[in-house]
Amino acid sequence: MIRFVQYGCGKMSKYTIQYALEKGMKFVGAFDINEDIIGTTIKGVEIRPASEAEAMLKELRPDVCIVTTMSLFKDVYDILNICASLGINAITTCEEAFYPFNSAPVLADEIDKLAKKNNCTITGSGYQDAFWGNLISTLAGATDKIEKICGSSSYNVEDYGIALAQAHGAGLTLDEFEKNIASIDNISEEERKKLINKGDFLPSYMWNVNGWLCDKLGLTVTSQVQKCVPQTHSEDINSTTLNMTVKKGMATGMSAVVTT
């Protein structure tokens, strides 16, 4: 029987735990940073502080750690590094972790080498894996000639966790969106490369998928740019995910356009 622990017990964990249990896996540990839920139980398993994860992973020795916390690779690096060091498989909904090699190559290479050294798998998966990645590569494999691949996808950030909502700029004024999100892309190619090499680049979710697709299809990327455009609504919207009312005219999310 596969034994698993859950790292991050927010909205997405409700589904990952359910799916794992439905597949016959055994739930042996849970971790979070939220003081309001630490000490409570999920399916009879007590949620422990995230700070105790390393010690408990050494004790529990699960087969896999499911990580559902943040969207940026640098924000899940510590727990992935712990898992890789201990030889524990880890799978995460962190969108950048699907293909971090074109946005955080130094950190990705460190985790990759450590996982191979200790004979375990560290991977990112989720919506983009199935529908933006493998579905497209499968269709491409059955196509005689491809000149361009164009795609568009939309989803409700309210259905996901706070990390995704914040990464999309939901709840920001348009000025805040411009300063904190959109302006980050108004840089030269040289400046972008420096940010990427330092691990400070903020990729939209499609950035990593485009890199994955090019790698999968054997293509060499000569240039890649992204632009993030705020989306708004004509009326106030209450967000339980953000625990706030997103006022009329504020950003409800964004449209991320990546061209490779």
Question: Where do the protein language model's features map onto the residues?
Answer:
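NAD(P)-binding Rossmann-fold cofactor-contacting core
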Residues: Y15, E22-K43
